[in-house]
Amino acid sequence: MFQNDFDDSFQESADLTELIEQFEKSIEKEESVFLDEDALQRIMEYYEMRMEMFKLEKAIDYALSQNPYSSDFIIRKAEMFLHKKKYADAHAWLDKAALFDKNEIDIYLVRADIFIETNKLQEALSVLLEAEALTDETEKGFVYAEMSHVYELMENYPKALEVLFAAIESNPENMQILEDAAHLVDMTEQYEQSATLHKKLLEKNPYNWMAWYNLGRAYAGVNLFEKALEAFEYCIAVNDEFEYVYRETADVYFRMDDMKKTIEMLRIAQEHAPEFDDYSYKIGVCYERLEDYKNARFHYRKAIRTDPYYDSAFYRIGETYRVEERYDAALVNYKKALKLDEQNEDYLATIISVHRILENTQEATTYMYALVYSRTDVLTYWIELIQALYENTEYDEALEVCAEAGLRCGNFAEFQYLESMILFKMGKERQAMIALENALIKDFARHTILLDIDENFYHHQKVRQLVELYNK
């Protein structure tokens, strides 16, 4: 049986090759050779699959020269104009197709595509509603799928899912429509509704592997992990070449905190898509969770070999070294990550933390400035920088940063409290008390920042007297 299937496939491929050669020779020699409509469609599909658009257009024009009244070929011509973004010409050719077969569903689908590309979503929807009235139950699935796409572009996700579910019920064996459902279910969190629909599909056809996959995702969405794993197992039993099911199975095991099973599933997924560098990274995360830092680093580096700009992988390598208290090695990798994403707040904050552990005061301050300027709107970053300068007795600089913070971040009372502390340390007691009084008037509740940063200042007699005065 297998040999017969192979022979048929081989013969079909040989026939297509011969057909393409015959067509290309006729074009080259400018000879007209009659080809039936089926042969012409096969030629077009061949060029379309290979994205050879110039040759595809030649094939369409050739087909039209022999079949000028064929609505199929006229629609093909309209699609070619759509590809070229010549929208008026595309509409004109669709109008021509309608003269020969006004009920042809593809006329409406291609016209909707034109409206979608030109951001005329309401017009696209109107065309598809017209098409819905003309189609039989099987064709309705394609119309509903296109409608779902329009609603999604309109950001009406519940309606997009509702229509897509209708498409699935009309055409339950269409894998593309089933695949589209997965992300819409996640966006709308309609997991129970998805589970109900896909169970109904599986009652009719238990070999529908995409339905098993979607059912598994629905169960995972409501944390029914054992049921999700069972559904994924059925999916694999029917189609063990489907890469995404291994990824989703791995994700469920990860959420169950079973790192060893997660790694096992990720390895299988990686066999199906070795070019996907994220698998090595994910395996690294699992080993890191298992506190096997050497293996974690091995897989992070493997991900980096595939993608040298994988900043997250450099960062995770740094984290494994930090846990082992190998701070210099950690910093090397943190800085590589930061070089690839220069304003990443997590990277900057971690580098600051390590420099503080190593008591590299100047380096820590340098990166604190970088953190502040990466997000000038974050109050806590300014406070931490001013506090660091204050603790390093760099009072003049701390005072300048207070003024800059007020301008860049906002006129927060915290900056006035910090200013009062700095002025006091600089021996400017009168100015310090004025700044403190202004801060207390502005926002008394924030005065506890004084206690957090300098307990001695907070308990100073004059400070206590002023605080008590405004403690109403």
Enumerate the language-model features and the residues they cover.
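Structural marker of alpha-solenoid helical repeat scaffolds
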Residues: 66, 99-101, 134-136, 170, ...
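Start-of-helix register in tetratricopeptide repeats
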Residues: 38, 72, 106, 139-142, ...
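Canonical positions in the second alpha-helix
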Residues: 63, 96-97, 130-133, 166-167, ...
